[in-house]
């Protein structure tokens, strides 16, 4: 896959872009995360022409309004940290944004593997995107042995964009 021509990145959040500091599957609180710099460094190395960085995440565990407000602060902070880091190394990064889906309903258009989050971001920035050929998604739900699902991979496939598992990306 030719990463150098990719200008638009959709990236999963949990276990892809961040991991918990506690080592637990689910965070203890909104501060229990560490941005995965090896992932950002690999993006810088492989995608020097990146213009757009979009975080897309299923968050079915968010039940209360307070949980959602706190998570919104968390994902905004992560987006800001990542965008600042990437912009310090990449000359072309223009846009960073995020969307997350709190629904556990598998038919919700925004819940991966459905494509609603990608469609919304693509539509919001479409005047700056030449083609879906410029897009790629990185995730950890790839249907590999030990993965809990293949929702990231299926989401990218249904949206007709390239996909790579974060573990494979780090080894590339």
Language model region names:
Residues 136-172:
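Acidic, Mg2+-coordinating phosphoryl-transfer loop and its flanking beta/alpha structural elements
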């Amino acid at each position: 896959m030719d990463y150098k021509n990719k200008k638009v990145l959709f990236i999963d959040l949990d276990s892809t872009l961040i991991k918990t500091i506690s080592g637990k599957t689910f965070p203890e609180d909104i501060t229990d995360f560490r941005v995965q710099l090896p992932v950002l460094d690999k993006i810088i190395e492989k995608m020097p022409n990146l213009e757009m960085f979009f975080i897309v995440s299923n968050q079915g565990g968010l039940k209360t309004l307070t949980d959602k407000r706190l998570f919104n602060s968390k994902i905004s902070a992560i987006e800001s940290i990542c965008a600042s880091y990437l912009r310090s190394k990449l000359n072309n990064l223009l846009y960073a944004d995020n969307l997350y889906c709190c629904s556990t309903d598998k038919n919700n258009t925004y819940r991966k593997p459905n494509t609603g989050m990608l469609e919304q971001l693509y539509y919001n920035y479409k005047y700056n995107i030449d083609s879906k050929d410029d897009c790629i998604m990185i995730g950890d739900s790839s249907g590999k042995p030990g993965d809990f699902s293949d929702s990231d991979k299926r989401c990218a496939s249904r949206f007709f964009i390239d996909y790579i598992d974060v573990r494979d990306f780090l080894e590339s």
